[in-house]
Amino acid sequence: MNDKIAIIGAGSWGTAVACSLGKNGHRVVLWSHTAGVADSINTEHINVKYLPKHKLPKTVSASTDMEEVCKDASFIFLASPSLYLTSAVEELLKFAPFSHDDGEMPYPTIAVLTKGFIPDENGEPQFIIDVLEKMLPDFYKNHLVYVAGPSHGEEVAEGKLTGLIAASQNPMCSIRCREILRSRSLLVYSSLDIIGVQVCAAAKNVVAVAFGVLDALTVTSDIFGDNTESLLLAAGLNEIQTIGRAMGATHPETFTSISGVGDLDVTCRSKYGRNRRFGNEIITKKILLSFENLDDLIKNIDKIGYLPEGVVACKYLNILAEKRNLKLPICSGLYKILNKELKPLDLIENLLQGDTK
């Protein structure tokens, strides 16, 4: 397969997808915003910063030059974190074919791997796909693909059996993405429910942070255990469905699919989960002491050393809950913890006793 595939974002997930595609015979070029990461991929065939334990195929290379990465690519995956995604796309738009919106040049298919929301001018969460459709040439209206599912990058790179959903309002685009991604170890299913899949992908990270808090509290309290975790998981799924309905999701089966309960389960329970880790470290490392409030935490989130997307999503979902009068006890309670208005133990006890105030 000689078609070039570009991946914008050389974090653990973008690199893992590149690894899988490379093993499947594709030529892949990663865009990294740091030269050190690109150099390690090109010289050692390892992403030393974000995926250091996994050797990459020689068909995978990297560059900090956006034009070089995207030139002649037939397929582009966007994998930058939600905080930085629009900046990366603005850079992408400077180069052909995106710099010539004449409808004549062939446009590559674009799929989004990023999980999260992008706020509007009022701070309410917007779907990533909606924001990108406004930024990209008109051709991409209803033609973007959103990819999600229970898929930690470490296991995808190891070739462990994984399932993903490729959602698009254009069935042919989702099918093309499915055919490019799937392999013996990567099962990919098509979906038309691009709204529901995006809600699940973003909101489950908030639940996972709360799950990490509970995980840490089980060590210091004898009233929490495996049963408690399942109780929180079920409450989290219910909350995600509430968010989905408020944001226009119309396919309830999405929430019980691999992109719904499947992704929620692995994000909460897996040892690889950054959101669970962050929630745990709120208790075990008193990590919030280094920040004044939630806004300060988001502004200086690089200081943590890893990116828990649930922290950012929590802020936007709390705004959504307040403006639309939604009962989101996990999101709203976690917001108060991150903003230093509530003690972690109080949140968990309130949730598990059915107090949604």
UniProtKB/Swiss-Prot annotation:
GO molecular function: glycerol-3-phosphate dehydrogenase [NAD(P)+] activity; NAD binding
Binding site for NADPH: S12, W13, H33, K115, G153, R274, L307, E309
Keyword Nucleotide-binding annotated: yes
Pathway in which the depicted protein is active: Membrane lipid metabolism; glycerophospholipid metabolism
Disulphides: none
Subcellular location: Cytoplasm
Binding locations of sn-glycerol 3-phosphate: K115, G149, S151, K204, D263, R274, N275
Highest taxon of source: Bacteria
Active-site positions on this chain: K204 (proton acceptor)
BP GO annotations: carbohydrate metabolic process; glycerol-3-phosphate biosynthetic process; glycerol-3-phosphate catabolic process; glycerophospholipid metabolic process; phospholipid biosynthetic process
Pfam families per the UniProt record, alphabetical: NAD_Gly3P_dh_C, NAD_Gly3P_dh_N
The keyword Glycosyltransferase appears for this protein: no
E.C. code: 1.1.1.94
Reactions mediated catalytically: sn-glycerol 3-phosphate + NAD(+) = dihydroxyacetone phosphate + NADH + H(+); sn-glycerol 3-phosphate + NADP(+) = dihydroxyacetone phosphate + NADPH + H(+)
Biological role stated in the UniProt entry: Catalyzes the reduction of the glycolytic intermediate dihydroxyacetone phosphate (DHAP) to sn-glycerol 3-phosphate (G3P), the key precursor for phospholipid synthesis.
The family this protein is said to belong to: Belongs to the NAD-dependent glycerol-3-phosphate dehydrogenase family.
Protein name: Glycerol-3-phosphate dehydrogenase [NAD(P)+]
Organism: Treponema denticola (strain ATCC 35405 / DSM 14222 / CIP 103919 / JCM 8153 / KCTC 15104)
Lineage, highest ranks first: Bacteria, Pseudomonadati, Spirochaetota, Spirochaetia, Spirochaetales
